[in-house]
Structures are given as structure tokens and as C-alpha cells.
């Protein structure tokens, strides 16, 4: 009986106070936080360069990035943020087939439904993060079969632009 109540007490404590980490894990987390601002600044600078490089490509119908003057909330972004952030969305002509072809042609950028890594990651929201929504609801939200979301990492922006440009060239052929 005492064992059972102690066990439930531990569960209650974890549910209401969260898990506890080891001292080493805390130290690693602290070391990462010390450079977080520098990393996000660099990633945001790269994201803006990449977003600009995607504008006007014949296979892309739109580039969605709040750091671009063409974004409908650009002024709000300037008021609330120092930079436009690390995530770019862009819409490919050709739908899901084009989106998957582009993702599979990338060499540096990883395919994943995660965000915010030191490595650049691309995802297809319609089949990952938003797959449970109805097609009508996805359409209302602007999540089409051609939409890709790129979370920019710490790689050199020129290398990422080259990787994306190469994958886009493969679509045109």
C-alpha cells in the first residue's frame, strides 16, 4: 500500500512539476542558450537571402516570408521582430509531385517535419503537420499540395541557395 501511494505520488509530482534533468543535461542546455541569439540571427539573415533568391523562379508561384517587403504583415514584422525569422514557406507549381521531387533532389537540406534545428529542414505540411485536416480546411489555410516549409539552419546561405537552385532546375527539365 505504501509503495503504491509513493509511486502515485511520484507520478503526481512529475505531472505537476515536470521531469527533472541531470546536472550535465542542464549544463548542456545552458551552454546552448548562451549562443542561441547568435545562431538565430545568422539563421534569419540566411533565411532572408534564401527567400529573396526564390522570388521570381518559374516553378514557384509565391514565397511567404515576413522579412520580405511583399509580405502582407511586413510592417508588423518590423515592429515586433528584429528580423524575419528562420522559416520560409514557398508554393511550387505542380503540386505534390513537384514538392516531393524537389525535396528528394536536395542534398544539404534534410526532409523532416521538425523545426528549429542547426541543420536546414524542409517539410511538406499537407502530408505531415496538417495531414489530419480536411482538404477544404487546408485549402482555407493556404496549405496546398505545392506548399513547402523550409526551416533554415546554420549552413552557409550560398550553399543552401545552390542546393535549392539545383533542385529547382531538376523540376524544369
What do the PLM-derived regions correspond to, one by one?
Residues 18-51:
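A conserved active-site cap/scaffold subdomain adjacent to cofactor or substrate pockets
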Residues 39, 120-173:
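PLP-dependent enzyme catalytic core of the Aspartate aminotransferase-like
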Residues 21-25, 79-83, 140-145:
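Short, flexible turn/loop "capping" segments at secondary-structure junctions
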